[in-house]
C-alpha cells in the first residue's frame, strides 16, 4: 500500500540510506508519488532516485516534479536500427532524448552533499550507457550527443561490463 511504501522510505532513512531508489517504477508512478508525499510529510529528507530505462514519456517525467530529485536513466542507443534490433523499439533514441531533456529541465544541474564522508547526489541526472560489443561507433555518438546537448548539466556513466556468453561455451 501507499502507507507501507512510505514506511519503507522512512525505515531506509532511519537505517542510514543515502537515498530512496525506485527501480523501473513508471508503472507505479501515481502510488510512488503519493507514498513519497506521505513520507516527506512525516520527515523523509532523503533524495528520491528514479532508476529508469529512459524509455519514458515527457508527460510521465513532468508528473514526477516535486517527487523525484535524481534521475538515473539509461541512454542505450542513438541508432534506431540498434534500438529495433535489441529493444524492439526503433523510436527509442527520440523518446529517450525527449525524456532526458525533460528530466534535465525538471531537476536541474547536479548538486550533492556529503554524508559521513560519502559523497551523495541530491539533485540532477545521471545518464548510464552500456557499451555493446560491435557498437563502438554508436557509443561514441551517444557520448557526443549527450555532451553537445547537456555539457556538464548531466553526469555520464559509461559501462562496459556486457559479456556475451555463447550457448555452446
Predicted segments, located by residue:
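Conserved AdoMet/S-adenosylmethionine-binding subsite of the radical SAM
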Residues: 3-168
Amino acid at each position: 500500500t501507499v502507507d507501507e511504501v512510505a514506511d519503507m522510505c522512512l525505515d531506509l532513512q532511519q537505517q542510514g540510506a543515502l537515498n530512496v531508489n525506485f527501480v523501473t517504477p513508471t508503472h507505479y508512478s501515481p502510488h510512488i508519488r503519493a507514498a513519497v508525499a506521505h513520507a516527506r510529510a512525516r520527515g523523509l529528507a532523503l533524495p528520491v532516485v528514479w532508476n529508469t530505462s529512459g524509455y519514458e514519456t515527457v508527460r510521465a517525467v513532468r508528473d514526477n516534479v516535486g517527487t523525484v530529485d535524481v534521475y538515473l536513466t539509461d541512454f542505450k542507443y542513438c541508432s534506431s536500427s540498434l534500438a529495433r534490433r535489441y529493444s524492439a523499439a526503433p523510436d527509442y533514441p527520440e523518446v529517450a532524448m525527449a525524456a532526458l531533456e525533460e528530466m534535465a529541465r525538471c531537476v536541474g544541474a547536479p548538486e550533492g552533499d556529503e554524508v559521513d564522508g560519502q559523497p551523495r547526489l541530491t539533485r540532477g541526472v545521471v545518464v548510464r550507457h552500456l557499451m555493446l560489443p560491435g557498437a563502438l561507433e554508436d557509443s561514441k555518438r551517444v557520448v557526443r550527443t549527450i555532451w553537445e546537448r547537456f555539457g556538464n548539466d548531466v553526469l555520464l556513466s559509461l559501462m562496459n561490463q556486457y559479456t556475451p556468453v555463447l550457448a555452446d561455451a
